[in-house]
Amino acid sequence: MTWGIVLLIVIGYLGLVVLLRLNESRLVYFPGSERRLIPPPAELQLPVQRVSIRTEDGLSLGSWVIRAGPDSSGYWLLICHGNAGNLSEFGRPAHYAGLRALGLSLLAFDYRGYGESEGAPTESGLYQDAAASYRYLREELGVAPGKIVIFGHSLGSAVAVDLASRVPAAGLILEGALTSVLERGQELYPYIPVRWIGRSRYPSIEKIGRVTIPKLFLHARADDVIPLTHGRRLFEAAPPPKTFVELNGGHGDAFELDSATYFGSIRKFVEAIP
């Protein structure tokens, strides 16, 4: 192999690294093309109240308030949804209905740049969005910290861990959680120095040790987006009290394919909150 060929390979590799760095946002965030929030199917009988939440930096976040029925437990779930699409897509309303059936009220918000929310997604921005939604629960809805359970799925698990490390709450539920975006990125692109060039970190593995409230980890065995090993490692790094539940299904359908275990685990967790 001549030096000229070696030089071309090096230049091509560096070009690929630069290209990935410049397009990092597109590789990390998948807001989708649907900007409007789609009303939930009538058969779910979800009493959705559309609200707008204002962030500290002045952005408006499209959000849903879904109150529990007469059998309310008094607890509220603050939903940090997964990465793809907005809060009304990909079967999420059915998920909300299942949670509401447990006597839980919900506040689901869209991250900046997702759905009807203004702005563009960034790591610090998503943390601000969760903090603004928590403030809305406290100040606008009058919910006490001891009645707030923070819920995060997939990328939302990192947002939820960050929030739980900074504010008082009753509990934390993580589904399909990752240790960090950088680690998952390195697994997906093993020949690229993702840990060195990545700006979006979401280092849950570094923050979970500060979360001392009760924690429930849910992870599907066949999850091919965030492998089970991520959830296990995060669980091992977390202080007690904590519970880990393995589920049948994939990254976003365990609540349907293993509904008894899924919702039964959440019910048991909430009922055990001191």
What residue spans do the PLM features occupy?
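Short alpha-helix in the alpha/beta-hydrolase fold that links the catalytic acid
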Residues: S204, I213, P227-E236
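Acidic catalytic loop of the alpha/beta-hydrolase fold
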Residues: R221-I226, G252-D253
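An N-terminal hydrophobic leader/cap segment in hydrolases
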Residues: I9-R54
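Catalytic histidine-centered segment of alpha/beta-hydrolase-like enzymes
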Residues: G250-F263
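Membrane-embedded segments
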Residues: R54-Y136
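Short beta-strand/loop motif that positions the catalytic acidic residue
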Residues: R210-T212, F217-D223
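Short glycine-rich catalytic loops that host catalytic nucleophiles or stabilize transition states
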Residues: F244-G250
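Primarily recognizes the serine-hydrolase "nucleophile elbow" in alpha/beta-hydrolase
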Residues: Y136-L141, G146-Y191
